């Protein structure tokens, strides 16, 4: 079992989103994720949560964004109950038998995510 955690400032994401708009989202998120974020009333918090989740996952992997792992290797989506889950796009970044558990939270200032890979 491996664990990763990340925290990101909502202000940091707000600055990037204000400066680059949807181009910023498209750089770090897959189209399905972008669509989900743009539907949320708090777009920046939704983007920040996914950003933190992806960072937490690569920390749990131990590779960071290297060795073929990149922002779009996996998507952070939500099930019918709103719980986050990982949709693996690039099978080489995670072994097929891996189970990834995620927890994402945010307040007015930051978003945090914890990833557990079993």
Curated annotation (Swiss-Prot):
Its EC number is 2.7.8.7. The keyword Metal-binding applies. Keywords: Cytoplasm, Fatty acid biosynthesis, Fatty acid metabolism, Lipid biosynthesis, Lipid metabolism, Magnesium, Metal-binding, Transferase. It catalyses: apo-[ACP] + CoA = holo-[ACP] + adenosine 3',5'-bisphosphate + H(+). Pfam families: ACPS. InterPro entries: 4-PPantetheinyl_Trfase_dom, 4-PPantetheinyl_Trfase_dom_sf, ACPS, Ppantetheine-prot_Trfase_dom. GO terms for biological process: fatty acid biosynthetic process. Its cofactor is Mg(2+). It is an enzyme of class 2 (transferase). GO terms for molecular function: holo-[acyl-carrier-protein] synthase activity; magnesium ion binding. SUPFAM superfamilies: 4'-phosphopantetheinyl transferase (SSF56214). GO terms for cellular component: cytoplasm. Mg(2+) binds at residues 6, 55. It is found in: Cytoplasm. Transfers the 4'-phosphopantetheine moiety from coenzyme A to a Ser of acyl-carrier-protein. Belongs to the P-Pant transferase superfamily. AcpS family. NCBIfam families: acpS, pantethn_trn, PRK14663.1. This is Holo-[acyl-carrier-protein] synthase. The gene is acpS.
């Amino acid at each position: 079992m491996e664990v990763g955690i990340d925290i990101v400032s909502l202000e940091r994401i707000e600055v990037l989103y204000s400066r680059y708009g949807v181009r910023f989202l498209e750089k770090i998120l897959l189209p399905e994720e972008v669509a989900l974020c743009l539907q949320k009333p708090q777009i920046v918090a939704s983007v920040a949560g996914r950003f933190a989740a992806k960072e937490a996952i690569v920390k749990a992997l131990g590779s960071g964004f290297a060795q073929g792992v990149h922002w779009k290797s996996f998507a952070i989506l939500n099930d019918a109950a709103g719980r986050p889950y990982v949709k693996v796009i690039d099978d080489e970044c995670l072994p097929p038998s891996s189970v990834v558990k995620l927890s994402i939270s945010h307040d007015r200032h930051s978003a945090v995510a914890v990833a557990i890979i079993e």
